[in-house]
Amino acid sequence: MTIETIKRIIEEENVRFIRLQFTDINGTLKNLEITPDVFLESWEDGIMFDGSSIEGFVRIEESDMYLKPVLDTFAVLPWTVDGAKSARVICDVYTPDGKPFEGDPRYRLRRMMEKAEQLGYTPYAGPEMEFFILPINEKGEPVPEFLDHGGYFDLLPLSKVEEIRRDIAIALEKMGITVEATHHEVAPSQHEVDFRYDTFLRTADNAQTVKLVIKTMAIFHGYHATFMPKPFYGVNGSGMHVHMSLFRGDKNAFYDPDDPLGLSKELRYFVGGILKHAKALAAVTNPTINSYKRLVPGYEAPVYISWSVGNRSALIRIPKARGKATRLEYRSPDPSCNIYLAFAAILAAGLDGIINKIEPPAPVEENIYHMTSERREELNIESLPGSLKEAVEELKKDDVIIDALGEHIFEKFVEAAEKDWKEFSTYVTNWELQRYLYL
């Protein structure tokens, strides 16, 4: 998209404000709102902002940063506030000397995309975004209660939530994001939105937009949408399974018609790389304390480091489709992650597998959830970290994933995770009160 096209859209749509969007290291979408006149005057050189108050960015003595709009991401928001139309554009973050900011999560993914392209690959991804829709109280605060007791693919006649999902799909289509499906998920009040796959970078941009639209539509209907991985005990948590493939030109590099399973060496090496780095990856793809309440046996979440052709109890599943649709599904990520950092780390792990020809173990087609510990030991099946603390310790030992994050983000990321863990470790929970108060 050219600046001339954007100028025409601004005039035709009577856009009054433009939101410059970027993402902090926690994955939180930030924005600076400016007028179209300021945007058209400043887009090329960048718009200055104070980076010292953004989580994981810079200290107060080096606070000046610049937002440079990525013009192809310009879109008019399909809702108004007080009748005024706004547009948004996603931005890259730059330092005052004109260099990409090392702490910008989007830059870390761009860097890994460039590495893949140097190897001759274009990486594609498509995530499945799961979330809960909850009621709110008179103060507008979310209430941790179910709105419905529906299950997987259930139809809820005349349900307000059905209207929310439709409005989400319509809004995303207006913003240029193709929605392939929306449906009720396994847990009560849990839902999923699937959108068309694209390159890793464009998909990460789209995922941030999808989360914004989901939350906005829920608010308009008087509800709260949460991407918390495990808000309720005893039911499935919300994951973000990621389907991914590598292409060379218009050919899927993961497909080999001469292989008995139709799978190329490159796919196997890519799988081998992810499995090798899976423990460290967990810190990035499952970055909250609550993430590890989801990663437990019995709730369809992966726990064991393995791969399979079709078996959903494995960490990596290869769906049955072949040809251009050949892909792997990485099942551990959850929607609390910073998707730019998660994609950068996953891509780094997979490319490490290809570069170093890391052979994965044999695929496991048994139900791993039903295996004994002796059987898992016999097959050398290890487990993902059981807590954020364990995952961060694994991350500290993994140079490939550290390099993908960059030293700046790695240090800030670990610092934030360890602070959360320390606070959580001293916090007295309701479970403890219920269990021990009468001692």
Curated annotation (Swiss-Prot):
Localization, per the record, is: Cytoplasm
Protein activity control: Inhibited by glutamine.
Question: What SMART domains does this protein's entry cite?
Answer: Gln-synt_C
What positions does the entry give for Mg(2+) 2 binding?
A: 130, 185, 192
Per the UniProt record, the site (Important for inhibition by glutamine) maps to 59
The UniProt note on the cofactor reads as follows: Binds 2 Mg(2+) ions per subunit.
Q: Which GO terms describe its biological process?
A: glutamine biosynthetic process
Q: Give the catalytic activity.
A: L-glutamate + NH4(+) + ATP = L-glutamine + ADP + phosphate + H(+)
Q: Which GO terms describe its molecular function?
A: ATP binding; glutamine synthetase activity; metal ion binding
The UniProt keywords, alphabetically, are:
ATP-binding, Cytoplasm, Ligase, Magnesium, Metal-binding, Nucleotide-binding
**Function field:** Glutamine synthetase (GS) is an unusual multitasking protein that functions as an enzyme, a transcription coregulator, and a chaperone in ammonium assimilation and in the regulation of genes involved in nitrogen metabolism. It catalyzes the ATP-dependent biosynthesis of glutamine from glutamate and ammonia. Feedback-inhibited GlnA also interacts with and regulates the activity of the transcriptional regulator TnrA. During nitrogen limitation, TnrA is in its DNA-binding active state and turns on the transcription of genes required for nitrogen assimilation.
The protein's name in its UniProt record = Glutamine synthetase
Q: What species was this sequence derived from?
A: Thermotoga maritima (strain ATCC 43589 / DSM 3109 / JCM 10099 / NBRC 100826 / MSB8)
Gene behind this chain?
A: glnA
